[in-house]
Amino acid sequence: MTRTVAVLVGSLRSQSINHTVAKALAKVAEGRLVFDFVEIGDLPLYNDDLWHDGRGPEPVERMRAQIAAADGVLLVTPEYNRTVPGVLVNALDWGSRPWGQSVWVNKPAGCCGAATGAIGTAAAQLALKAQMVTLGMVVMGHPEFYLKFDPEKFAEDGTVTDESLRGFLKTYTDALAAHIERLC
């Protein structure tokens, strides 16, 4: 059965390497997972005063509906100053409120990321995974995904040109699909 994954990328940059990686994962997962990319750049900074009658601003309600409708979640994070970008934390905050109405609870989830440095996004992912567990997501622990990004391994359309990398992405998406299937 094909499952839907809400994908949140923690970078707003138009040429984001993490968007490139997320699109490559989507291509590799075709037929097993459908990636529904969630726009988080238009979310206001979290402010409890913006809730009215249990509803948040329109971008918040759109994001929450996408996540609620998905079978699982994939957070694709860059690493800023050895931690998670504020835009991604902001999305997590909006999704966890109002109290008792979190869209994250019991959601099968994965976490991955890419950077140009040798350790990929290891520090950010450690922080993010702790937050994901705190929010009640059921986080896939293995395989881990810390990618040192090499632009020469991707075509302009996002297709992975390196066979070894394509295999790694397939292993990851196979594991994510199995994780979601077990929990749905």
Where do the PLM segments sit?
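Glycine-rich phosphate/pyrophosphate-binding loop and the adjoining helix
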Residues: 138-184
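Short hydrophobic segments within beta-strands
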Residues: 8-10, 38, 112
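Short connector loops at secondary-structure junctions
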Residues: 36-45, 144-151
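N-terminal beta1-alpha1 ligand-phosphate binding loop
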Residues: 2-32
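N-terminal beta-loop-helix "entrance" segment that forms/cooperates
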Residues: 40-57, 154
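Helix-loop-strand module that forms the ligand-binding subsite of alpha/beta enzymes
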Residues: 55-136
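A generic structural motif
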Residues: 30-36, 137-138
